[in-house]
Amino acid sequence: MNGIFTTLLYEMEKHHDTVLCTIIADSGSTPRGMGAQMLVGEKGLLCGTIGGGAVEGQSIELGKRLLQERRSTVHEYKLHHNDTEDIGMVCGGDVTVHLQFIAADDPAWQKLAGEILRRIALRQPGWLTLAPALPVMTERT
């Protein structure tokens, strides 16, 4: 998580928008589980991984498109042979990825990333909750 948010702040300081990709649900056999993250910029992967392979590759391409459209989305990948969206993986599971557009000038994300890095440096616990409206960092009790 340190690398993701260090890179996010760096990109924001350079006035570069990004997309934060987070696995928000998984079932069956998958390369990575819920909570895995990567950060995507206009040229592709900046930091992190959500498991490599087709899921990561397609999420990077979708992330680059979302940067141009300046929007977020949720995308579900089926990692088994199917007739609707076969991506060629045979792991047997399903993965849902939240792709969150982050504008470089968004003060809420700047504050959140700084707070996360501060807590990591001080080894302070906390909960990161990503909701559609606004990210929030709360005390863990």
Regions found by a protein language model. Give the residues of each.
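Segments forming oxygen-rich coordination pockets for charged ligands
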Residues: 1-141
